[in-house]
Amino acid sequence: MAIKAIHARQIFDSRGNPTVEVDVTTAKGLFRAAVPSGASTGVHEALELRDGPPGYMGKGVLKAVANVNSQIAPNLIKSGINVTDQAAVDKFMLDLDGTPNKEKLGANAILGVSLAXCKAGAAEKGLPLYKYIATLAGNKEVIMPVPSFNVINGGSHAGNKLAMQEFMIMPTGASSFTEAMKIGSEVYHNLRAVIKSKYGLDACNVGDEGGFAPSIQDNLEGLELLRTAIDKAGYTGKVXIAMDCAASEFYKEGKYDLDFKNPKSQASSWITSDAMADVYKKMMSTYPIVSIEDPFDQDDWPAWTKLTGECKIQIVGDDLTVTNPLRVQKAIDQKACNCLLLKVNQIGSVSESIKACKMAQEAGWGVMVSHRSGETEDNFIADLVVGLRTGQIKTGAPCRSERLAKYNQLLRIEEDLGGAAKYAGENFRRP
């Protein structure tokens, strides 16, 4: 079925910044998608087209909206491409753009159309979105993911002094996604009580992704808070810990500055890649850490390869790989990590996201589907993680509606699957 109409508009994300929303209309109805945006962005990501000053602090997206309405819409409609041919829809837009990083039309323009068209394709096929995505990826079975709840926020996501960006809990010992949500919620509320009693009510303010942002600087203190909350909730042994260090954010002149939020940070206290690796090893030996994301700068390749070779846990590439098949292949060749963080807006289309996922899975890697810190109520990635059967998702704390939109959709999907639902659990790396 051909596309009848495409219309884009400027809306707002969870940080109050403009973003792109796209409506695709077919004979089956209107299908809407909104594009997320990151705070800690990799330099190798596809280009998110912004208007620049003066309006909206330079973050307006009217250029991207205009590119959808005046360039993508008329040309894609005229092409007559069937909305169920996702690869053709995406290739048409990539060819129309003609640049390696989508800088002409904007990745945010292309992705909005790609996501909306995927929803339209599912309706055309009469399938739930997660099952349609599974068919696009060639998967006969689907799996419910382990949620990685970001419950303590630091780095560029919070106004505290914590260098590392995300301290997460993973209910790997749950028997279903529904139970994982119960565990996540209970640990979260126990964590709030622990933080309140130790640092006061002010410390219970939350960051961009719904996690708490207590005014602490010691990363080990953050991990200790998690361990205490897990124990108080009664889930020791059922909940593992994951981290996103976002180390590119505190990489300076070849070293790592764990006090990077302090404008008077002393260069003499910055540490080498090897010393940084020792910090991680100490954490791993003390806490039930099963996954570390972006432990080093996005171009500090030797450090990545060395750590991945030395430890057994999951090492996740985000800024390193930016969901880009070329970067993923380089990381595979150099054995730089063993898990891909999949963010649809880093690469800018559904088809390329599926390609990057399949490439990682075929290399024996894990894949974790991820939100961005600037999110909307769109819940596409919930269906994506089930359809691609990656077994793990991170989309914030069990707090803030733009985060719960994804988790609630996963609850609906598990209900829809009924007795056929399988939870990845402790096999989240290779479900």
UniProtKB/Swiss-Prot annotation:
Its cofactor is Mg(2+). The active site is at residues 209, 343. Mg(2+) binds at residues 244, 293, 318. The keyword Metal-binding applies. PROSITE patterns: ENOLASE. SMART domains: Enolase_C, Enolase_N. Pathway: Carbohydrate degradation; glycolysis; pyruvate from D-glyceraldehyde 3-phosphate: step 4/5. GO terms for biological process: glycolytic process. GO terms for cellular component: phosphopyruvate hydratase complex. Substrate binds at residues 157, 166, 293, 318, 370-373, 394. Gene3D superfamilies: Enolase-like C-terminal domain (3.20.20.120), Enolase-like, N-terminal domain (3.30.390.10). HAMAP family: Enolase. Belongs to the enolase family. This is Enolase.
